[in-house]
């Protein structure tokens, strides 16, 4: 059953062009979450992942900039209010020459913020466990299985 749910989520993500958005960088977190096994930021983003942060709905561009990210990589009420209100992500600062990047997640597929708020640091070596939970969305006929990312 769990494999079927994860396979369906993976296909849904592929249908959304790999869960990519104009502001999102594919760092590999969506694929790692859909695999269903615990992972760390450093395993996914590489050994040069120095710091990581959660980005939750209603992230403020100035808040992201204060953490070291490009404010243009963050949704706002002015450029995409629906994503600003609903999408979550994980942002990574690298110790090498790579640009800081945020991978954003469609809320019907992955929720990076159960119990977290924007700017909460993520230990790059701490296990993140993807757990599938049913979520009720307005207008849907029934619950949707969403992958929740839980830091241990």
Regions found by a protein language model. Name each.
Residues 25, 62, 119-120:
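Secreted/processed peptides and extracellular or luminal domains of membrane proteins
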Residues 20-23:
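Bacterial signal peptide processing site
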Residues 45-113:
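Mature extracytoplasmic domains of secretory-pathway proteins
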Residues 15-18:
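C-terminal motif of bacterial Sec signal peptides marking the signal peptidase cleavage site
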Residues 1-7:
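Bacterial N-terminal signal peptides that target proteins for export
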Residues 111-152:
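C-terminal partner/receptor-binding element of secreted or periplasmic proteins
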Residues 27-45:
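Post-signal peptide N-terminal segment of mature Sec-exported envelope proteins
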